[in-house]
Every structure is written in structure tokens, then in C-alpha cells.
Swiss-Prot record:
Basic and acidic residues bias (residue ranges): 329-348
Entry keywords, A to Z: Nucleus, Transcription, Transcription regulation
UniProt-listed InterPro entries: PDP_family_Arabidopsis, PWWP_dom
Job description of the protein: May influence gene expression by regulating the function of the PRC2 complex and modulating H3K27me3 level.
Record-given protein name: PWWP domain-containing protein 6
Amino acid sequence: MGNILPTGSRVSENEGSDDNKLKEHDVKMENVKEDSEQIGDNVRSGVSSLRDNFEELENGFHVGDFVWGEEANSQQWWPGQIYDSLDASDLALKTMQKGKLLVAYFGDGSFFGWCNPLELKPFLENFKEFSKMSDSRRFLLAVEDAVREIGEHVEKFLVCDDAALVSSVALNLGIKDGVVVPDVRRKIISSLVLENPGVVLEDVKRLAMTVRFDDLLEIEVLRRKISAFYRCKGRFDLAKFDEHRYIIGLEDKEHESCQRLLRKCSGFASKKRKCGDVATTGSTTLRKKRLSEVSKIETAEKEISNGKSLSSRKRKSKRGLDENDDDGIEKREESNDSNHLEESEKKDDLATPLASICKRLNVDVSSCVKRCNGNGEAILQTGKRERKKSKYLSPEYMTDFSCRARKIKIESAESSQIQVAVRMTTPNTAIDVVKLGATPEEMLALIRAAALNAQYPKDYNSTSCDMVREFVSNYRSFNNKRNLSDVEKQPEVKQEIVDEKEKTRNEPGVELYIKTGFGSTLPSKDDLIKTYEKFGALDKERSYMFNNNSCSCVAFVNASDGEEAFNRSLEKCPFATTSTVTFKLEYPSSASSEKKEAETRKGVTEIECLKEKLEGIRALLDQSEGKITEELKMKLEDESRNLLDKVRKMII
């Protein structure tokens, strides 16, 4: 073996080589000595590129590539993604095979596989073909998951911001927990995103103008382009729509149960006819009817031959069948295609519950009916006659079969009819335009003409003018009638409002006096008015400050508002102060006398209550007879405590 030179020539190590060859090699070395470093770099890069090309040709796929692989159970092409073997879970390592790639299939994340590169096919190149191979919900959901994952890579490629988009975590039994989904090669994503390199907005505009999408992948790529465009503009993301997904394995059962309910309720399944000529369907129904009638006749003959006695009703029914058998068959054979269609529809209608009820009621129709008119002549009427509908088939009898509910509905219907009759007899009836000798449209045209043209009486004849005048007078008398009850109620309401206003006017006001400690001042008059306005209306003219702003008077219009302000001020001072503040409420002369009388009455009652308490304590002491027990001590403590509480609560 020889040493490899930068030019690619090989030097032999044998001692018996010719001197001429050595000289030639030395000449070559001298010619390229100056550019040896540059050539060496080119050779190294070429070797590395050859190594990469060799690996790509040998393998054909990289980690992160989307592929189609055959599922082991169904032998069907399934979407998946290649992962690094270092990320394989313990379950996947048990079935690991040398020289094969780890593929995690999309879907519910329950299956994976170690696949030979020859068993895989690229995802994008075969998407249109393989995505339409099955219509099962499980396969379609797997394809949607794969397309959604590709869309995330597309948006990440367009946004170029790692902080904005976070890579998702792989969820598969063959992959370790917490492993991030590998990135796809930029060459694949760029070929998918950009038809014309560097043009994104024009691509979106073109798709918006054509509004044509070849497959699901194209829709996802467009959606991700628009989302990336909004992200670059600093706007919100696109709205996400999640389709309603059924539980795998239960969607067919749910569909069958719904269909079963439809069949039970409305005879849905029996109404599905076979596609074909109407004549063929009619012939099959005729054949079935003939066979059923012949079988009935044969069974009746066998019963007669065996000596079984038949009732009169059965004999009549058999006789009717024998007489009408031939005629009925001939008439059915002579009927046209439309009659066959009607018969098939009748048979289908009998499948419904309402038709079965009608079948129980004997409402058969004969083809020919004899009727007598008033003169006694018999009239032969051919064709279908009108059936007399039973009242028991009306909705009020069909919906609720309870006797009580039926009586209630009948009574409500009768009462509604009575109300309608009473309403029709009242004077508020509609205007009869026919009596005026014109239709509503003509009257409307005449009224419009009279409203638009001031010279209406000159343009039209006297009859039309009279009609308009009569209609307007009727309309005014019809529309301007007042309800006497409403007119009578109006003065009462007005009187109540006036009484309330007088009460508020006659209600005496009250004055709140505020006094602060020595050496301190109160807030200004405006500040006090703003503070106490929240309790009610104030009389600003009667409100004033005195004693060098150490005292003030706030006049309230209503006594109730003043009392509320007084009580709130006693609880907590409504303005900031550093000294003690006293509040006093004074009523006017008339109100003060009433207030004083009430206070005196209250004081008298409180004194009487104290006397009763003292008498009770004295009675306990008299009953003790000079001996004090524990029970007596407890009673005296309770009574004295109650007495002291009453004394503390007394207002001086």
C-alpha cells in the first residue's frame, strides 16, 4: 500500500521501482506545492460530502422524517415519524433489531416498529395516494395528526422564533417519556412551503383567489402561513377548531342504535325501496298478494275436508274472497304504472304506527259505490270515495289516552270557542270593507291618492270620495275607543302621586349640630355639605358655620336622612379630625314637640319596666326568709344584671 497524496496520486514503497517514475512524481509534487493547502481543504470537504451522500444513499431517511410504513396487524400503509434509537423506551429496546429504524406511528400512540429503510416510503411524495387508501376513522385521525405535526414544523420554520413556539412532546409507547419531537430537515419544509423561494404573501393571495385545495396537507400549510403572518405582525393567533371525535370502536354501535330507534318510531327501514322500474315493483307486490290469497283458499278447503265447522262470519269472508278473487286480479293486471306506485306507497305507509291503527278500524274502500240522491235515483260512483275520519284519530285522542286529560282538552277547546264568540259580538269588530263597495287594495289606493293629492275631490268622482270619508270615520271610531277602566284608574294614580309629593313637602326637616374640641376647627362649609350630601338632600341656605369654625349646623330636608346621618356619625366620624367631636340632632318646633312627647312616653315605659324589675327582686328577697341559697344567689345576679343593662341603655 502507498501513501495518499493531496493530488490523489499513490507512491509505491517497493525498492525495485523505476527512477523515471520517481522523477515524474517529484515534478508533480513541485508543481502543486504552492497550492497544497487549498487543495487539501477541497479534498477534505469532498470526502465529507461523499461520506454524507453515501450515508443518505445507504439509509435514505433521517431522524425526524415523516414516512409511510406498513402496520404489522393490518398490512396497511400508516403515517409515522422516524426517531433516534437512543430515545427508544424499554419496551421498544426489547424488540430492537440492528440496522433498522425506529418509527413511531401516529394515532392513539399505542404502536411503533423497527423498520428496514426499504420498507418505508416518503410521506410527502406519497401523501395523495396513501391518504385515500382507507375510510376508517382510526386511519383518518392518524393522518390528521401527522398533517398537524407537519403544520407545526411549517409555522416554526416561518416564524423563526424559538421562544414563540414550543416543541411538543412525543406520546408513544415506543418513545421515552419527555422526549421532544425531532425537527424536520429544512430542505423538506422549504420545498413544502415555498413554491417560489422567498415569496409567501403572493402564495397566500393566490390561494385566496383560487380557493381550491387539492388535499388536507395544502389546507394545513395555508393555515400555518396565515398564522405565521399574524405572528410576525404582532397580532393574535388564528382561532382553533377541534372537531367532535368519537370514541374509537363505539361510533358504529352508536349509529346502529340511532337507526334502530328510527325504525321503531317511524318505520324508517321499510320505506327504503329498491332502485328499478316501477312495473317490476308492482309485479312483485301482485305476485305476493296472489300467493297469500291462494294460500288462504287452500287452508279453508282443507278445514272443510277435515270436517271442521266454520262460523258464519268466516263463511262470509271466504265467500267474499271467492267472488272477488278473479275480478280483483284482472283489475290489478289492467292497472297502469301509477297505480302500482300507489299500491307500493300504501304498503309502505302501513308500516307506521298510525297506519296500523287505521288498519284495525275497518275503513276499506270499494271501487264502485251506489248512492241515492234526494229524488230517489241511484247514482253509480266509480273511483275512491271520501273516508269518514274517526274522531279518535284526531290529535287530542292520539297524544294522550287518559280520560282526564281528554276531558280537560275538550273543555279548553269549548271555552276558547266561547271566548271567540264573545269577542266577535263585542263592538271592537273589524271594519268590513266589502260593505263600502270596494276591495282592501282599492281602499288603500284611494287613501294614498287622497293623502298625496290635495285636489283629490276634484280628480275623483263623488262615490270614491264618499267611500274614503266613510272608511276614515269608521276607522277613527274603531280606533279611538277608550277603556273606561283605564280612564277611571288614571285619576287614582295621579292622586297617589300628588299625596306622596305633599307628604315629602310637609315632612319637617332636621338640623345636625357638630362641635369640635377647644383649639381645633372643623372642615369648611362646602366640605361638610359634600360629606353629608350622600345621606340625603340638604338645605344649603340654613347650613352655616359659627364660633370661629369650631361649630357648624347642617340642615337636612328630610328628618329620616338627618337621623341616619346622626347615627352614622356617632358610629364613625365621616371626616378626618384630631380632636373629639360631638354631634347633636335638633328638630324644629312642631317636630320637636312631637319628638319630645314620644320620648316622654318612652321614658315613662322604661321607668315602669325598672319598677317591675325592682319589685321582682324584692319578691325574691321576701321569699328567702333571711336565708341565701345558691339558687337564690344566681337568680339575684341575673335580675340585677338585667336591671343594670336597662339603666345603661336609657337615653337622658
